[in-house]
């Protein structure tokens, strides 16, 4: 039963992003957590505070407006005090210049008592870098910005 509740909460979180409701996403993170995305692009890096994670989601929304996920699978294991979950997805979006884009990946979660303590987002980072480069060419300077990170 617990795993079904976690799957439902994760589906709801992705539905919120699909609907452009990002504010509730950050509220699900523990005050101290790990939010990371590998790569060398404006959405890469690692964050450990709610403030920096909120800035990251704001940047995501600006760079990839209309981002929508198609969740393919959700796998959940563990107990409430240490739950792991993986969400496999395909996404689609339209760049600010009107170009359609897409990617595929996995969100890897560690939850404790319903709060996100770790989220690592794995996707085709070269593909994402290509989209960021395209945005920079079209004058979107933020797409070429340094990653938002508070880890030194």
What residue spans do the PLM features occupy?
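Short beta-strand edge/turn micro-motifs at domain boundaries
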Residues: 104-133
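Hydrophobic pocket/interface hotspot
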Residues: 13, 25-26, 33, 49, ...
């Amino acid at each position: 039963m617990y795993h079904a509740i976690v799957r439902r909460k994760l589906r709801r979180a992705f539905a919120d992003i699909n609907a452009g409701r990002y504010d509730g996403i950050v509220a699900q993170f523990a005050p101290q957590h790990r939010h990371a995305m590998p790569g060398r692009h404006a959405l890469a890096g690692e964050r450990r505070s709610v403030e920096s994670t909120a800035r990251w989601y704001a940047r995501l929304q600006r760079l990839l407006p209309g981002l929508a996920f198609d969740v393919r699978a959700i796998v959940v294991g563990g107990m409430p005090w240490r739950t792991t979950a993986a969400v496999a997805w395909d996404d689609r979006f339209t760049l600010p210049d009107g170009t359609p884009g897409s990617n595929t990946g996995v969100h890897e979660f560690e939850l404790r008592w319903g709060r996100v303590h770790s989220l690592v987002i794995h996707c085709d980072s070269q593909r994402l870098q290509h989209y960021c480069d395209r945005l920079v060419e079209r004058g979107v300077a933020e797409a070429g910005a340094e990653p938002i990170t508070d880890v030194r």
